[in-house]
Amino acid sequence: MSVLKKNLAGRLLIARDAVKKALNSIPCDVAGVYKMLGANGLVLYVGKAKDLKKRLRSYYNFNQMSDRILAMVGHITELDVIVTQSEAEALLLEAQLIKTLKPKYNIIMRDDKFYPYILLSKHEYPRIVKYRGRKEAGLGKCYGPFISSLVVKLVISALRKAFQLRSCSDNFFASRDRPCIEYEMRNCSAPCTRKISEEDYAKSVHMAHKVLTGKSKELQRELFDSMRKFSDNLDYESAMVYRDRLQALKSIQECVSFQTEMSCDADFVSIYGRSGTYCLQVISFRGGISYGSQPYFVDDGNYESESDVLGMFMLQVYSDPPGRVYVDCESDYCEVINAALERLLTRKVDILTAKSHEELKFLRLARNSAMEALNRRLRDKALPAELEELAELFGLPNPPERIEVYDNSHISGTHPFGVMVVCGKDGLLRKEYRKFKIQTVLNGDDYSMMHEVLFRRFSEESPSVPDFVLIDGGRGHISSAIQVLGDLGIPFACMAKGSNRNAGEEVFYLPDGRKICLDPDSKLMLYMRKIRDEAHRFAITSHRSSRDRTLSSAVLCDIPGVGSARRRALITYFGSIDGVKRARTDEISKVPGISIKLAQRIYAYLKQGMAQP
């Protein structure tokens, strides 16, 4: 019997009585929704079932439950059941109750920030920007929603380079009496100062519209024909404009994964589950172009089948779905989801099973991606047994849900960085990683650096407090950590390599003076080594990145005639020092403030390692 089950033994008997009472009031073979209530009527969980009686019986068998489900069931004092006319009605009611009640143990996957759109605003000179929010009348033309925010950013950047569309606010646009630096960098045609007519600007907007509606091939042919026509007429300057637009279109195609012959907007959604965890992979097409894919994870063993998880996902996440969504589930359940969505939305969405070769291909791709993503996530996860063993080893009252790992990196005190890596039962939580640029320690004192990092982390107000802290360090780090963590009551340990600094000889130092050694091949030791190594990797990467930025900037500092303003203009124009190094002389001379002569000097210095006289 697990530690958790022992602690909850009395509560589980109360929960079993609540389940039994609910079962006695439910007829057989009916669909519906059930609410698990805790103390003071607090709603803990909302679920739905095609067969309510069969579903509730599953809460009798405590031996088959995960620790997460046991913890939830252990707080049940009452079950409230609502019988519905159909499974579709149950699915819709479940989604509405979850949205309204926000139960503690339900997985709510909705992104309150909304998915990003590409917006061409309603204006005589429309601007192109990334937009999040509801589509409203008078806003302009929205393209999307798209899954990948990064790809949207890259596509907008490429479209601006291709068609010189503005991105500034209307207030900034109205206040200009001369072009800004975006015009100098050829990202904008400066309509604010009428450098382009409204008619010509509208043509550029129309070309961007073609790209965003999947008509890139048609546009490419038009641009190529125009380029050849200008070239035949010896108008090489105009031909170069169309050449640059063709190159920008190619860069957009590099951003997207692949294209399809389908002209409609569609998503392909596949699900894969293992060990009580599910991954839903969404591949999104807009105008026949794929703008990326996104995995969604659900850690919830309450669901009876993958189809149930899929139904929950559709109603919680899809606030604005495309016209077609292809899923890999039974066609009967597609009808259930369709019926629920029709009542939820004001427009029709088709939930379909794949039939054509192309549809099946993209669903298989989504399925394979879901399998890879879930297997990768499960490899990173800590098994409950490992966390229970960690709690027992270091005297924690419960298995830790949040572990923070700290490490420093520097070379002789230069470019010092401290880092925080976060992990728990769900694996490595990379979005919560943090870097600390050391500010007060100048002599490479590792103990003082660790003190600064911990002090800065725990001096701030944070809703996330770790259950356990692991420090990559030895006995000497104990005093630095006690000064910060001692009064807070946060348990910690320092993990040091052995005398020969070999893996497998690690030692744990505790604040009470104890020293612990583990079996080098034990699962707990392998887990501790994995999270320690992740912190070490992150620290080294942060240090190297800082060092490389400094060294790269120093390269331009030594070129006569290149001061801070020109250095900044070069890096802004080309995106990085590497971009400057790859540039030709004629490209460098296009940067505002860089003459042909200075461009030649910069090019020669970067290529040969010396400035020309």
From Swiss-Prot:
- Asked if the record carries the keyword Cytoplasm, the reply is yes
What does it do? The UvrABC repair system catalyzes the recognition and processing of DNA lesions. UvrC both incises the 5' and 3' sides of the lesion. The N-terminal half is responsible for the 3' incision and the C-terminal half is responsible for the 5' incision.
Spell out the SMART domains in the cross-references. Answer: GIYc, HhH1
Identify its protein family: Belongs to the UvrC family.
Where does the source fall among the domains of life?
Bacteria
Q: Which residues are in the UVR domain? A: 217-252
Q: Name one GO molecular function term.
A: excinuclease ABC activity
Which PROSITE patterns does UniProt cross-reference here? GIY_YIG, UVR, UVRC
The record's Gene Ontology cellular component field reads: cytoplasm; excinuclease repair complex
Segments forming domain GIY-YIG: 29-107
Protein encoded by which gene: uvrC
Localization annotation: Cytoplasm
The subunit structure is: Interacts with UvrB in an incision complex.
Keyword entries, A-Z: Cytoplasm, DNA damage, DNA excision, DNA repair, Excision nuclease, SOS response
Organism of this sequence: Anaplasma marginale (strain St. Maries)
Major localisation: cytoplasm
Q: Does the keyword Amino-acid biosynthesis apply?
A: no
Q: What is this protein called?
A: UvrABC system protein C
The residues the entry assigns to the signal sequence are none
